[in-house]
Swiss-Prot record:
PROSITE patterns in UniProt: HCY
Native organism: Mus musculus (Mouse)
Reaction catalysis annotation: L-homocysteine + glycine betaine = N,N-dimethylglycine + L-methionine
Gene: Bhmt
GO molecular-function terms, A-Z: betaine-homocysteine S-methyltransferase activity; zinc ion binding
Ranges of residues in domain Hcy-binding: 11-314
UniProt signal peptide: none
Pathway: Amine and polyamine degradation; betaine degradation; sarcosine from betaine: step 1/2; Amino-acid biosynthesis; L-methionine biosynthesis via de novo pathway; L-methionine from L-homocysteine (BhmT route): step 1/1
This protein's name: Betaine--homocysteine S-methyltransferase 1
A GO biological process held by the record: methylation
Length: 407
């Protein structure tokens, strides 16, 4: 397709990575928009793209200004089966097609305000958890893919998969489009929920057709990079080549179990004390780069200022700062303009690097005990349903939680 007159054609995702460029992803939309009052915690579905497009558009713009050069469509959990799961009924009230189309239109509009690409994204499905067949699950992915092709997204992402089997199905469905495919799993160093190690997960994803592989969500930057390192080693052992990608949480989760932060008792409404600072994220960006990761972004908890931290840390490699850095002094240097002298004394890198941050909660523990129910595909509690969760089903879960907590 010829470029529009007067507009310079953008380099594609693989062209950028082949040239050695650092690609910066965006942050966590469902958490950010839930805090702002546009997404409902629980289903975490993206109907805000239709109901509140201005809110979604503004968040895209803030990530773009912060340094993101990929606008992921706000299509996380936008599969038909998720939009009608457990009494949600979004698919009936709005339709999955409208949600996906609106998300693509918003992402494209903002991407074209800068040098950003649009990535159409799919994620794990209730159908897989309910033991539906490969044919049925792939059909769900193809429904979203039809919209992505119609809207001509630049590349595709299969993200947030706990089971490599389903992730492979997603990659295979997306790869049929002919567009580049990235694939990220929400796993830690222990591997997927069926016990498949990270290295083997990466190998399977690349063999399925993914050009970019890595992790997103569920774990903090440190743990996520441990997992990416294992993926890298697996690919090297298999003599396979792929670009590496990392989009972790912006929460510290050293105490979580195999299922990541969703196992923590603070999930999702008590995570604020765990939020990573901008300086934590600068450290993450440097460590990711040194590991060989060239697609670096974030997931839940990542706000625009976190993305700006990535862009600022990697400005020497990228050759420029993002527009949002106009209002941010490097390592707190802008504090030299403060009225209070003890605040001016904090206008230096050494202060912020060495600060041991207090929580302000004197009687609270620093770590939690994960719930760790250990359920995965095939477990009765994970069988999904179109109807709303019943009071009886909730009572049974409440009793099980009491039992687990007492162990």
């Amino acid at each position: 397709m010829a470029p529009v007159a007067g507009k310079k054609a953008k380099k594609g995702i693989l062209e950028r990575l082949n040239a050695g460029e650092v690609v910066i992803g965006d942050g966590g939309f469902v958490f950010a928009l839930e805090k702002r009052g546009y997404v409902k915690a629980g289903p975490w579905t993206p109907e805000a793209a239709v109901e509140h497009p201005e809110a979604v558009r503004q968040l895209h713009r803030e990530f773009l200004r912060a340094g993101s050069n990929v606008m992921q469509t706000f299509t996380f959990y936008a599969s038909e089966d998720k939009l009608e799961n457990r009494g949600n009924y979004v698919a009936e009230k709005i339709s999955g097609q409208k949600v996906n189309e609106a998300a693509c239109d918003i992402a494209r509009q903002v991407a074209d305000e800068g040098d950003a690409l649009v990535a159409g994204g799919v994620s794990q499905t209730p159908s897989y958890l309910s033991c539906k067949s490969e044919v049925e699950v792939k059909k769900i992915f193809r429904q979203q893919l039809e919209v992505f092709m119609k809207k001509n997204v630049d590349f595709l992402i299969a993200e947030y998969f706990e089971h490599v089997e389903e992730a492979v199905w997603a990659v295979e469905a997306l790869k049929a489009s002919g567009k580049p495919v990235a694939a990220t799993m929400c796993i830690g160093p222990e591997g997927d929920l069926h016990g498949v190690p990270p290295g083997e997960c990466a190998v399977r994803l690349v063999k399925a057709g993914a050009s970019i592989v890595g992790v997103n969500c569920h774990f903090d930057p440190s743990v996520s990079l441990q997992t990416v390192k294992l993926m890298k080693e697996g690919l090297e052992a298999a003599r396979l080549k792929a670009y590496l990608m990392s989009q972790p949480l912006a929460y510290h989760t050293p105490d979580c179990g195999k299922q990541g932060f969703i196992d923590l008792p603070e999930f999702p409404f008590g995570l604020e004390p765990r939020v990573a600072t901008r300086w934590d994220i600068q450290k993450y960006a440097r460590e990711a780069y040194n590991l060989g990761v060239r697609y670096i972004g974030g997931c839940c908890g990542f706000e625009p200022y976190h993305i700006r931290a990535i862009a600022e840390e990697l400005a020497p490699e990228r050759g420029f700062l993002p527009p949002a850095s106009e209002k941010h002094g490097s390592w707190g240097s802008g504090l030299d303009m403060h009225t209070k002298p003890w605040i001016r004394a904090r206008a230096r890198k050494e202060y912020w690097q060495n600060l041991r941050i207090a929580s302000g909660r004197p009687y609270n523990p620093s770590m939690s005990r994960p719930d760790a129910w250990g359920v995965t595909k095939g477990a009765a509690e994970l069988m999904q349903q179109k109807e709303a969760t019943t009071e009886q089903q909730l009572r049974e879960l409440f009793e099980k939680q009491k039992f687990k907590s007492a162990q």
